[in-house]
Regions:
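Small/polar beta-strand repeat architecture
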Residues: 1-47
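Short helix/loop capping segments that flank catalytic or ligand/cofactor-binding pockets
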Residues: 11-12, 43-48, 69-70, 81, ...
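Short acidic, gly/pro-rich beta-turn/loop elements at beta-sheet edges
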Residues: 11-13, 45, 103, 180, ...
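Extracellular beta-strand/beta-solenoid scaffold signature
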Residues: 14-25, 49-60, 76-80, 105-114, ...
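Right-handed parallel beta-helix
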Residues: 31-42, 65-76, 88-103, 116-132, ...
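Solvent-exposed loop/turn segments connecting transmembrane beta-strands
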Residues: 83-85
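Catalytic domains of carbohydrate-active enzymes that cleave complex glycans
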Residues: 147-152, 166-312
Length: 314
């Protein structure tokens, strides 16, 4: 028996009856389809800043395998910029920006980049004022990855908004003013309980990062992140940087055995040694660096146009 993806949770006879089932017939999903180079801007009642009588979803992906969404700007949506549904697998969403959402501030709204499929990659995505900027939903099978994603003025946590979304990777995900949660949410959201297991937050920043260990021995891991930390999970190298800069890019390069910089385009920040008394040469270098505008994720995404032609399918 050969599987095309790692299992994101253990399957034991002590837990439940486990079996392998072959799907009858041909794979009926659409394949090798994508959406790119668009602006999706919803009209709304400008006299009502909480208007919801307008477009909710930007790109909705279901019954698709090996698809992509690339270089799409979203504005004024009430729900999600991109949704990958349960029958979506091997989907890449990259270089996308969501701004100025219009809706009530409440549940099931502004789940900006929402993944309910498996083997989905969201990389270099930017979200403003999302309720849940980067999340997996209801039992997303995984593995799924959010890599180099920034949320600005976040109104709620990122992580998983449904129960048991196992095998999540948050790699260089930055949440402004809110949390990343890999934990037991109890009765929150109609009783989510354990929202994920066997997940990793790597080199992320957030107001708080919550990670719990699961009673069955499954762990959630937090490595080289910057935040306030809470929970019984595995926390290592807290408030420190680590190498490699991107865990995802490092593993992909190792698996393929070749350079993947054109695919991953990692925005690697320079690490300066902290010192109250730097040498003259180091101080001069720091002064020169301070004169340059900091490259934001929006700028990095905007710069993607010159890379796309060489890696775009077809």
């Amino acid at each position: 028996l050969q599987l095309d993806a790692p299992l994101s949770m253990s399957l034991g006879q002590d837990d439940a009856e486990c079996f392998v089932q072959r799907i009858a017939g041909n794979d009926w999903r659409l394949k090798n389809v994508g959406v790119e180079n668009l602006t999706i801007d919803s009209e709304y009642d400008t006299t009502n800043p909480k208007d919801e009588n307008h477009a909710w979803e930007g790109v909705y992906i279901n019954k698709v395998k090996d698809g992509w969404v690339r270089m799409v700007n979203f504005r004024h949506l009430a729900g999600s910029a991109v949704v990958t549904q349960r029958d979506a697998s091997r989907i890449t969403v990259e270089d996308c920006i969501s701004q100025a959402p219009v809706s009530e501030i409440g549940g099931y709204r502004r789940r900006t980049f929402l993944c309910m499929g498996e083997q989905c990659l969201f990389q270099r995505c930017y979200s403003e004022q999302g309720m849940h900027d980067f999340v997996a939903g209801l039992c997303a099978a995984g593995p799924n990855a959010f890599v180099q994603c920034d949320g600005y003025e976040s109104l709620g946590y990122s992580g998983a908004v449904g129960p048991w979304c196992t095998g999540l990777l948050f790699d260089n995900v930055n949440i402004d003013g809110n949390d990343i949660k890999f934990c037991n949410l109890g009765l929150e959201g109609y009783g989510i309980g354990w929202n994920t297991a066997n997940s990793l937050a790597y080199q992320c920043t957030a107001a708080g990062i919550f990670a719990d260990s699961i009673p069955d021995g499954s762990n959630n891991h937090v490595f080289a992140c910057w935040a306030q930390f809470n929970g019984s999970g595995d926390f290592q190298q807290c408030n420190n940087h680590a190498k490699p800069w991107s865990r995802f890019a490092s593993l992909l390069e190792k698996r393929l055995g070749r350079d993947v910089s054109s695919q991953c385009r990692v925005l690697e920040r320079e690490r300066n040694n902290v010192s109250n008394n730097p040498t003259y040469d180091v101080a001069q270098k720091m002064v020169e660096e301070a004169r340059k505008p900091r490259i934001t994720m929006q700028m990095w995404i905007a710069d993607s146009a010159r890379f796309t032609a060489s890696v775009s399918p077809g």
